[in-house]
Amino acid sequence: MKVSKLWLREWVNFSLTEQELAEQLTMAGLEVDAVNPVAGQFTHVIVAEVLNTKPHPDADKLTLCEVNINKDKPLKIVCGAANVRPGLRVALAMIGAHLPGGLQIKESKLRGELSQGMLCSATELGLAEHSEGIMELSDEAPIGMDLREYLALDDHVFDIDLTPNRADCFSILGVAREVAVLNKLPLIEQPIVTVAPAIDDGLRVNLIHSEACPRYCGRIIRNLNLEAKTPLWMAERLRRGGIRTLHPVVDVMNYVMLELGQPMHAFDLAKINGEINVRYSASGEQLELLDGQEVVLNDNVLVIADKEKPLAMAGIMGGANSAVQELTQHVFLESAYFNPVTIAGVARKYGLFSDSSQRFERGVDPCLQSKALERATELILSISGGEPGPVIESFDKKFLPGTVSFLFDTTKVKKLTGLSIPLNEMKNLLEGLGVVITKETNHFFEVTIPSHRVDLQQDADLVEEIIRLYGYDKLQAQPMQTSVQAGLISAKEKIATHVSSWFSAKGYHETISYSFVDPELQEALYPQKEFMELLNPISSELSQMRAGMWPGLIASMIYNSHRQQTAVKFFEIGVVFDLDGGQLKERSCIAGLLMGEQGNLNWSESARLFDFYDLKGDLQSLFASLKLNDVEFIQSSHHALHPGQSAQIVINGKHSGWIGVLHPRLSDAFDLDQDVVLFELNLESLINPTIPLYKPISKYPQIRRDLSFLVDRQISAMQIERVIRNTVKEDWLKSFDVFDVYMGKGIPEDKKSIAVAMTLQDDTRTLVDAEINLTISAIIKKLENEFSILLRE
């Protein structure tokens, strides 16, 4: 929000310097980012009048001018601007003047003709970044008057960075309220004239979706003066507020928005068919906006429409077809209250930003609409003339914000801030904000909140207001006077710490990504899930809560792979959000991925790419470190994973996660030329409820037996291992490893050869060959019965 100091002083008569005011506002929560002069440094520039002109005899693009400066005789000026003409009042830099950039004006000859000064453009005076021709001043500008005095250029603009809760300060009036209460000064109310209608014309307004727009005010003004121009004083105030001038009616709309905080819009009445309908758009409706962009609307965009078509995106931007043009003679003015939830996020979704949307999505005063409309009418009539109709107001009281009243416990100021502030001081501060105290009982105030402070809803909000107005600098540092008891670390926190350290030691890099994700990416990875949509997203690419950890990891991986990272090893621990039947449930997860080359360049071995088994091996090592023995990798299909390289992870009989290679369809979509291997696990599934017990290492010898089987291709090593573990008695099987898998020549097409190594050992004695042979025979028989496996010699 850009605020002119001189404009602000019309509302509250303070005597602070620019630096003092900036510090005061910043300490009160309205952070001032910059304080800038409204014009460049220049001297001896006055208002002058061009009396007559004639072409330069030796230069086609130069003009000889006689200029009146209210002295005995006119000055001779050579000018190169195309818009110089007799009768024009201009900005004249006199001989000896200093202009921005260090230019000093001297008497000189241009192509042989005397020039006793310089007619200036707005750019040359530091009043605009771009301008065409010299400045054209009002016909009423006093000849000979210093330009700085005439345009009130000894002014500064405060650039205020407002927090989202302070929508009330998006206006001169709002900031003036703050300055008044901070300095205990009265607010100079600017009277708003109620304009009597001169004609009976009006438009019917239908609030079809009144929950989104519970109040809509409008007014017709006919027979505008097409020759009218925006007065210089208004154009200057708009410039200082960061808004360029367009058309007298549009400029008034923007002026009232800066002054009072109510965004408004003007329609060309001739382009409206019959009536105004405030409704949601139909999916597929199109609208060309004021900036020339054509948008295709979905079914949740609030629009202002007539009988047949949308005219504007409500609260965001008007349509080009119904915009006020140079030849517009009849207008319809709009001043409405839109529900902030309806506007929030829509502008960002369509890549739009406007001063209106910025204000509406934070919340405007729901009682301001008719006042702003009267103020705009008054200004338009004074500039462009015209015949106003009556104010048309449609509202639905059911959806208008009600008056906020509650019982404020003043003792909470001490409890929450540690400051003892007298009750009278609290009362004065609150009343300075416009809060009405209807009753005082002991330490309680019955308060009614003013309609413009939509952010004040409870005790804590009033405590914040009191302390910021009283002064944060009065908060004294005090030692904590309480007993502090160390908290307990939960099992989930312990496992998260262990797993994070374990993966870091394995060479993985931990990532931390937003819980907000790109809807397109998430729907591609989890098409079977429901997703939680954000009402007010940071951007359209971050508009859903994540239902899994993979979107963030994949986005980080793509970012790094595009920056010549040849090996990517990432993991992330975080919370995911499951939407189940409208209920939101949070789940702690860990996920990771591998992509690229395994290991560093090494003369003794060639590099290879990460594969499924690298990640599976890391997970098996993790499970071993956590003493999780009942873990299975069961081949299964997942929409985001390769059909032949994906598996469910089952821990203690419960589905706990997934592992696999990213589906080729997705790899192609992400323009990846290498496999990406991913996993995701519920963090709680890694918590081992059993307490580890000491067990001595066996001093008896281990015995290894190798077996080679011919099996059907669809049978997994996990299935074979499960049968073997169930067959071997007691705790003899210490390890089970697959050391060879072969499919090809000499093997039937529907078969494969698997060779496994088993390590057998007893903790209390030495195993003898006879009992080992019986065990091996039992294993072979069981496998033959279960899977028709054939033992290979």
Swiss-Prot record:
Gene: pheT
Reaction equations catalysed: tRNA(Phe) + L-phenylalanine + ATP = L-phenylalanyl-tRNA(Phe) + AMP + diphosphate + H(+)
Domain named FDX-ACB: residues: 698-792
Obligatory cofactor(s): Mg(2+)
Listed Pfam families: B3_4 (PF03483), B5 (PF03484), FDX-ACB (PF03147), tRNA_bind (PF01588), tRNA_synthFbeta (PF17759)
Subcellular location: Cytoplasm
Gene3D superfamilies: 3.30.56.10, Bira Bifunctional Protein, Domain 2 (3.30.930.10), Ferrodoxin-fold anticodon-binding domain (3.30.70.380), Nucleic acid-binding proteins (2.40.50.140), Phenylalanyl-trna Synthetase, Chain B, domain 3 (3.50.40.10)
Gene Ontology annotations of biological process type: phenylalanyl-tRNA aminoacylation
Name this protein carries in UniProt: Phenylalanine--tRNA ligase beta subunit
InterPro entries, alphabetized: aa-tRNA-synth_II/BPL/LPL, B3/B4_tRNA-bd, DNA-bd_dom_put_sf, Fdx_antiC-bd, Fdx_antiC-bd_sf, NA-bd_OB-fold, Phe-tRNA-ligase_IIc_bsu, Phe-tRNA-ligase_IIc_bsu_bact
Matches recorded under SUPFAM superfamilies: Anticodon-binding domain of PheRS, Class II aaRS and biotin synthetases, Nucleic acid-binding proteins, PheT/TilS domain, Putative DNA-binding domain
Native source organism of the sequence: Legionella pneumophila (strain Paris)
Residue span, tRNA-binding domain: 39-148
The EC number(s) this enzyme carries: 6.1.1.20
UniProt enzyme class: ligase
